[in-house]
């Protein structure tokens, strides 16, 4: 076998969900399992964390429908809400909670009354989705008069994961003010806010990336936050070549040896979901020893420096997991672990442990 493999660890998912619940205190924990459970598998992630959380969060109705069709009865929040009357009716039929983030959704609800649980989303400064505070208050009044009163207020922090965060306090005050005026529960905390701002926990938190063993911060590791690795990506060495000083490696000859080196060829590439934009110097580990990527990532292969290492064809190369922190790989690539998890393709073997 080629040996390119993704290992999903159920015990780590459970640990991380319990860690979120511990931090949340009395607040409900809605585990975000959108985007195929951040690349871990929608059903796998949901079923593994069922006993540790109060509900689940998805982005779109089809994800929620899949969960319901597989017997998951926990409350499910659909973060993008509904796109048309048909989806609105389906949300009611499936007993889903839907986010109302725009005035056109308010009008659609008023024109198509449905017994659906509504969370009004307040734009408290992120300027992506959400009603302005005055719009949210007006929408709540109109929906209540029509017999479909919202059950909660939610918002989303823009900068809770940043070292110098000057926005979250203001956002919390704005969203909290709307919730207080409407006398409704508030949900605003993502992973970063759950870990960092106890005041923001309110009545419901919506952790995502921390559940999958990754830190939302660049100054604290997942292990330091009490999280465990749930996603390990590995491959095998399929060749080792001697390269002389002045010789280049890979497409575009982007890396040139300054002295004689031993270059390992690894059976993984962007066709498997390894980031094509990973630069030379990105960490990998051979038999538990960290070394680096050299040259450009190909569709099916990468090349790494194994000079001085005890390395043979067939040996395992960890791309991220126990030795190589996924967040270090993400930083090297100028991206975030969320993208790395989500872009793994169907080609690597999946192992559930």
Curated annotation (Swiss-Prot):
Q: Does the keyword Calcium apply?
A: no
A Gene Ontology term for the protein's cellular component? cytosol
Question: Which transformation does this protein catalyse, written as a reaction?
Answer: L-alanine = D-alanine
At the top level, the lineage of the source is: Bacteria
Could you tell me which pathway this protein works in? Amino-acid biosynthesis; D-alanine biosynthesis; D-alanine from L-alanine: step 1/1
Key words, A-Z: Isomerase, Pyridoxal phosphate
Which Pfam families does the annotation name?
Ala_racemase_C (PF00842), Ala_racemase_N (PF01168)
Give the main EC class. Answer: isomerase
Among its keywords, does the record have Isomerase?
yes
User: Which amino acids does the record list as binding substrate?
Assistant: 128, 299
Q: Name one GO biological process term.
A: D-alanine biosynthetic process
Cofactors (names) = pyridoxal 5'-phosphate
Q: Which Gene3D superfamilies does the entry mention?
A: Alanine racemase, Lyase, Ornithine Decarboxylase, Chain A, domain 1
Q: What positions constitute the catalytic site?
A: 34, 251
EC number of the protein? 5.1.1.1
Tell me what this protein is called: Alanine racemase
């Amino acid at each position: 076998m080629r040996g390119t493999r993704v290992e999903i660890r159920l015990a780590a998912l459970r640990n991380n969900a319990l860690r979120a619940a511990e931090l949340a205190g009395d607040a409900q924990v809605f585990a975000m399992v959108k985007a195929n459970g951040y690349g871990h598998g929608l059903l796998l992630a949901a079923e593994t964390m069922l006993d540790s959380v109060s509900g689940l969060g998805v982005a779109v109705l089809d994800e929620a429908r899949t969960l319901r069709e597989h017997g998951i009865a926990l409350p499910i929040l659909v973060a993008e809400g509904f796109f048309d009357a048909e989806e609105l009716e389906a949300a009611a039929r499936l007993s889903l909670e839907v986010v109302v983030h725009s005035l056109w959704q308010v009008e659609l609800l008023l024109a198509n009354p449905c017994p659906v649980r509504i969370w009004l989303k307040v734009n408290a400064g992120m300027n992506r989705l959400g009603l302005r505070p005055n719009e949210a208050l007006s929408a709540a009044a109109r929906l209540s008069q029509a017999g479909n009163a919202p059950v909660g207020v939610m918002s989303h922090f823009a900068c809770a994961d940043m070292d110098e965060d000057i926005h979250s306090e203001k956002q919390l005050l704005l969203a909290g003010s709307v919730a207080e005026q409407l006398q409704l529960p508030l949900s605003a905390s993502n992973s970063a806010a759950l870990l960092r701002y106890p005041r923001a926990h309110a009545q419901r938190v919506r952790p995502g990336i921390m559940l999958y063993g990754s830190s939302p911060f660049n100054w604290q590791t997942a292990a330091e936050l009490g999280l465990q690795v749930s996603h390990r990506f590995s491959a095998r060495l399929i060749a080792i070549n001697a390269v002389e000083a002045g010789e280049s490696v890979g497409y575009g000859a982007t890396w040139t040896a300054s002295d004689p080196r031993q270059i390992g060829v690894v059976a993984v590439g962007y066709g498997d979901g390894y980031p094509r934009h990973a630069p030379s110097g990105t960490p990998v580990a051979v038999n538990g020893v960290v070394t680096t990527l050299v040259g450009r990532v190909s569709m099916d292969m990468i090349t790494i420096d194994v000079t001085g290492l005890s390395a043979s064809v067939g040996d395992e190369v960890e791309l991220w997991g126990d030795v190589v922190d996924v967040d270090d790989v993400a930083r090297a690539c100028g991206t975030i672990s969320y993208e790395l998890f989500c872009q793994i393709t169907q080609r690597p073997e999946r192992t559930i442990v």
